[in-house]
């Protein structure tokens, strides 16, 4: 009877606790912070935002990242709400538009100023109308309004603030009123749909990066009052073709038109005093560049990767031009060769210095360096993809080469050094030191067979890029040996240089190091690699390289086509074995493969790889990196792999795996699809160990889903217990220093499917 009497009170108590906990949880998620001056500076919580009576100011980033649908101001003497937006009490200041506002928005005619970030992150707004009463907009007004297409600005607006429309990726056009005198930095940065811009003549100042990354901007008109094109103003406007009204510009700052790859013409003013560093870098379609008489300074790389011809006014005291090339005033330094000039580039006589990037990226078929030039560096020819030959003068004393300078120019097949040069000579199109000891410059487009001179001692990585079919050297050479068209060290133990056009390769008996092949693998053409039966360090099977006993797969050939199944004798795979396997389409990892927990299988640039299947076996953890595997569509994992670490998976990949492992999470991370192959048992609960005389008793809670349990260490199985009802077993004292693991298993398709293990330390 007493139980029935107090039951309603008990239920009321439980309900009160539940409501209290729920309220506490909600309160824990909400933040409402007001400082001692009355500024609301931090908020998170309900999308309906109450502006309490103690709030007299709103911080500029108070609602950053917060979803808001409307503001309420009941009882507040400083603010009011109109249609859910927040205003000052007198209605002259628009403070905040709710971030979830959709469609169009019209600012009331009472508003004179729009506050900092007022519309920032209103990602659903499509159009805004600003009345003529507004004269001031603060920074970041419309930043990141991704769907905003149209904005009508006030005719009395005096300036456009910093980042005002930055990230408005749908904004197609905008009319800037003639009342505007300045536009601040990044005002239209990353407006990727903006197609044209016309600056009224009232504008005298436009800040840096104002239109940078407007990748669809095709046409721009500058204001007549502008005297400078600011830093990075049109940087990366890749579709920009014309810039109008430039005749009054006195300064073009650095990066101003960088990467405007379709910019065809630019009118250079008589008033133009300076052109900044990289101002026209990579303006690939820029035609004739005319340097007027008043231009005093041209910065580093100003026209690198640009122009088809340079013309310098004859009265310019600082620069000159000859044969379409830009030179210093005395004609001694080549500042820039026009990259769009095709055919033979014959650098004028009198030039004794060549700027570091004067030639890079040029379309020339040959380059002749004039007498008088004494110093050059190999990377000065970087990107000259049409280049077939280079002619060096007898005056050349120094040719600088740093590690990594090797050029991969597929057409370059001839280097010629003028007779009489005391420092270098050329033979069969290759440049050597005068004593023949060093390869100085090997033309990477050279094809066929090549024989290294007997005197040569060092090649470094100068032959890293080649298109040779074979490389040989005299048997009398003290420094190198050659077998089967491959160059080795004098003892034949390691590869020094490999002919990149070679389709197959046999590793000789003496070779014990193939690291060179790994370094150049991305450029190899080999479909298969065999190994001499006398080699003690390597073996091969089906054209794939293993260690001598076939336990470790070391190297999969770049051009080996189709699917591949790892032999069952293989226990390990080198982390980079499948890097740059360009023709591999599918891979099966067999049951005996095991791997250190902290090792990763790399499949970088396996461009045709579509699927990988891992068989049930030794692996319980797998780490893979799929950089450049854009066609990968399917991964299949067994129940034994509990944890996966999958990096750079392409979006949309399908993973076939087991529930209660991490396969599903991996698929979700890649925005892909998870296909369940079943569910592994849950972790055993209640596991505990106690000592009983000379042995230990392990106990656990029974699991109804289990078909049995396995008790084991890292080295061996202790017990294999059948039946879900088993809840304990004894462990011999010899395992007293070991970590003990227990896991449940169930039978599916006549095979054991193990769950995750629970570990316990006996000691």
Stretches found by the model and what they are:
Residues 709-711:
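Short beta-strand elements bearing conserved aromatic residues within extracellular beta-rich modules
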Residues 727-729:
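Short strand-edge motifs at loop-to-beta-strand transitions and within beta-strands
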């Amino acid at each position: 009877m007493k139980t029935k009497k107090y039951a309603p009170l008990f239920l009321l108590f439980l309900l009160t606790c539940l409501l209290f906990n729920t309220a506490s949880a909600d309160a824990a998620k909400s933040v409402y912070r007001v400082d001692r001056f009355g500024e609301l500076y931090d908020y998170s919580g309900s999308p309906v935002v109450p502006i309490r009576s103690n709030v007299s100011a709103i911080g500029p980033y108070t609602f950053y990242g917060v979803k808001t649908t409307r503001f309420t101001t009941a009882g507040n003497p400083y603010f009011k709400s109109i249609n859910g937006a927040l205003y000052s009490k007198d209605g002259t200041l628009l403070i905040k538009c709710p971030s979830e506002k959709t469609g169009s928005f019209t600012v009331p005619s009472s508003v004179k100023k729009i506050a900092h970030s007022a519309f920032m992150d209103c990602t659903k707004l499509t159009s805004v109308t600003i009345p003529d009463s507004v004269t001031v907009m603060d920074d970041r007004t419309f930043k990141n309004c991704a769907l905003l297409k149209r904005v009508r600005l006030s005719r009395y607006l005096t300036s456009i603030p910093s980042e005002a429309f930055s990230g408005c990726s749908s904004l197609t056009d905008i009319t800037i009123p003639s009342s505007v005198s300045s536009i601040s930095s990044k005002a239209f940065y990353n407006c990727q749909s903006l197609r044209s811009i016309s600056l009224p003549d009232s504008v005298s100042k436009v800040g840096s990066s104002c239109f940078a990354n407007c990748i669809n901007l095709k046409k721009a008109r500058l204001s007549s009052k502008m005297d400078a094109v600011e830093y990075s103003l049109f940087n990366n406007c890749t579709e920009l073709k014309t810039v109008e009204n430039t005749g009054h510009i006195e300064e073009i700052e650095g990066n101003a038109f960088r990467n405007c790859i379709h910019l065809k013409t630019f009118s250079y003013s008589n008033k133009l005093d300076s052109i900044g560093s990289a101002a026209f870098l990579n303006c690939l379609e820029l035609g004739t560049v005319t340097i007027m008489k008043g231009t005093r300074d041209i910065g580093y790389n100003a026209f690198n990767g640009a122009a088809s011809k340079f013309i310098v006014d004859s009265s310019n005291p600082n620069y000159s031009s000859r044969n379409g090339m830009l030179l210093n005033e005395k004609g001694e330094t080549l500042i820039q060769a026009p990259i769009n000039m095709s055919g033979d580039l014959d650098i004028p006589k009198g030039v004794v210095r060549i700027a570091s990037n004067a030639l890079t990226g040029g379309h020339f078929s040959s380059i002749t360096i004039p007498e008088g030039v004494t110093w050059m560096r190999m990377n000065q020819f970087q990107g000259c993809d049409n280049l077939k030959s280079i002619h060096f003068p007898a005056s050349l004393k120094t040719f600088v080469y740093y590690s990594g300078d090797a050029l991969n120019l597929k057409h370059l097949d001839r280097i010629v050094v003028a007779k009489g040069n005391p420092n270098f000579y050329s033979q069969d199109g290759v440049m050597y030191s005068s004593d023949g000891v060093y390869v100085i410059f090997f033309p990477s487009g050279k094809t066929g067979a090549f024989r290294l001179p007997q005197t040569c001692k060092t090649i470094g990585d100068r032959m890293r890029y080649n298109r040779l079919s074979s490389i040989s050297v005299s048997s009398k050479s003290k420094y190198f040996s050659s077998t089967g068209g491959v160059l080795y060290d004098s003892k034949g133990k390691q590869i020094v240089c490999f002919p990149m056009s070679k389709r197959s390769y046999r590793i000789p008996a003496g070779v014990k190091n193939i690291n060179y092949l790994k370094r150049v693998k991305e450029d190899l053409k080999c479909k298969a690699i065999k190994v001499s039966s006398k080699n003690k360090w390597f073996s091969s099977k089906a054209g794939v390289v293993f260690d001598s006993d076939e336990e470790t797969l070391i190297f999969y050939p770049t051009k080996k086509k189709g699917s591949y199944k790892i032999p069952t004798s293989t226990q390990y795979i080198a982390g980079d074995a499948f890097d740059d396997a360009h023709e591999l389409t599918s891979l099966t990892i067999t049951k005996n493969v095991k791997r250190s927990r902290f090792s990763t299988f790399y499949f970088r640039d396996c461009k045709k790889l579509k699927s990988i299947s891992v068989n049930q076996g030794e692996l319980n953890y797998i780490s893979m990196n799929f950089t450049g595997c854009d066609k990968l569509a399917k991964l299949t994992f067994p129940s034994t792999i509990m944890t996966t670490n999958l990096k750079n998976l392409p979006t949309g990949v399908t993973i076939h795996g087991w529930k209660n492992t991490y396969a599903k999470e991996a698929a979700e991370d890649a925005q892909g699809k998870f296909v369940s192959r079943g569910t592994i048992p849950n972790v055993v609960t209640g596991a505990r160990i106690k000592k009983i005389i000379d042995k230990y008793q392990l106990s656990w809670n029974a699991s109804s889903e289990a078909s049995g349990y396995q008790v084991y260490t890292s080295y061996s199985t202790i017990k294999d217990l059948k039946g879900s009802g088993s809840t304990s077993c004894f462990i011999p004292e010899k395992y007293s220093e070991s970590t003990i693991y227990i896991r449940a298993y169930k039978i599916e398709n006549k095979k054991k499917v193990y769950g995750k293990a629970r570990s316990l330390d006996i000691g």
